[in-house]
């Protein structure tokens, strides 16, 4: 079994690509419950490893998009090679014995240097999108940063880390997907992917939006409502009408190098870009960001709030 790990920033087409991959019989690509990012820093609180396994299984059960096949705690304990969360993570994903398994927890790039994560021998799929469109999307979403400054800083950090991983990873273990290319020629992207990893190419992936997994995703919250629709090929350059002139300027000032490295042209000339921001400006941005995040949370639908509540109960209990 080989392990595909998607990396990058949310709102960049990762769920779209996951659903396309999930149409291949050889690939198991469920919606991610973000097991590692949730439990990695909590594991030190667990004196009982069995309790950690139990909580990780419960966490998957409360994932916003339901899993069809979750192994029992007993099965997990019988199949792990070591008592660590990376092994629990592996067994949960590989329970159905797929040829390839895929995790869409994009922030798992943070575990790149962990020896136990390295043992899983991940094949990184770096999916990236024009950061200004990512920012425009985050401003409307119920998750993530909300002020353009904070979104820009997060996007910058994520791209830098992913590009560092690319430099230090063997070519076979790294595959880049530019979101805009996926929109314009998905067949080319998927065909190249299949050739590289020995998959049998078929056009079934284009019907991802008709799949049961897609229907489950699109009815599970506003974040994924487009997933039950055919590919929206013009879903790019929206920032030009959705971000203000100043927001674009702030984003480009922080991300000039990363945007250009990834093949995106700037709207603003170098002479217009801010060289820095004062501590007062940054404090103001952070306060606005905090208020907007609270507002976004309050605007989540009841289904999303209830699931978050159930998950919080799991990790707030004495371990």
Regions found by a protein language model. Name each.
Residues 88-89, 158-162, 189, 247, ...:
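Alpha-helical packing segments of well-folded alpha/beta enzyme cores
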Residues 1-5, 139, 200-319:
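PAPS-dependent sulfotransferases, especially Golgi type II membrane carbohydrate sulfotransferases
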Residues 9:
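P-loop (Walker A) phosphate-binding loop of NTP-binding proteins
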Residues 23, 29, 35, 133, ...:
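Active-site micro-motifs of SAM-dependent methyltransferase domains
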Residues 28-110, 118:
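PAPS-dependent sulfation machinery
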Residues 15-27:
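A conserved segment at the C-terminal end of the G1
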Residues 94-207, 211-230:
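PAPS-dependent sulfotransferase catalytic domain
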Residues 24-31, 190, 197, 201, ...:
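A generic secondary-structure signal for well-formed alpha-helical elements
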């Amino acid at each position: 079994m080989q392990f595909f790990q998607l990396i990058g920033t949310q709102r960049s087409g990762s769920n779209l690509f996951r659903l396309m991959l999930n149409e291949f019989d050889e690939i198991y690509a469920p919606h991610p419950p973000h097991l590692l990012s949730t439990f990695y820093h909590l594991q030190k609180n667990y004196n009982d490893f069995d309790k950690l396994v139990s909580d990780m299984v419960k966490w998957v059960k409360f994932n916003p998009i339901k899993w069809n096949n979750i192994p029992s705690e007993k099965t997990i304990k019988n199949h792990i090679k070591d008592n660590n969360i990376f092994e629990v993570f592996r067994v949960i994903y590989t329970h159905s014995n797929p040829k390839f398994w895929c995790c869409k927890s994009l922030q798992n790039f943070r575990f790149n240097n962990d020896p136990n994560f390295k043992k899983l021998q991940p094949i990184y799929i770096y999916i990236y999108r024009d950061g200004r469109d990512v920012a425009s999307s985050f401003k409307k979403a119920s998750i993530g940063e909300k002020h353009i400054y904070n979104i820009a800083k997060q996007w910058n950090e994520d791209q830098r880390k992913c590009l560092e991983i690319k430099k230090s990873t063997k070519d076979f273990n790294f595959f880049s997907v530019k979101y805009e290319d996926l929109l314009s020629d998905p067949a080319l992207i998927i065909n190249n992917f299949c050739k590289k990893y020995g998959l049998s190419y078929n056009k079934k992936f284009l019907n991802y939006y008709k799949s049961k997994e897609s229907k489950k995703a699109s009815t599970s919250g506003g974040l994924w409502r487009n997933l039950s629709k055919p590919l929206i090929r013009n879903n790019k350059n929206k920032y030009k009408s959705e971000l203000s002139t100043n927001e674009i300027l702030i984003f480009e000032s922080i991300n000039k190098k990363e945007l250009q490295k990834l093949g995106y042209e700037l709207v603003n000339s170098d002479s217009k870009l801010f060289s820095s921001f004062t501590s007062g400006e940054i404090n103001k941005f952070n306060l606005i960001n905090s208020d907007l995040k609270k507002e976004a949370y309050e605007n989540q639908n009841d289904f999303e709030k209830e699931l978050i509540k159930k998950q919080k109960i799991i990790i707030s209990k004495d371990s």
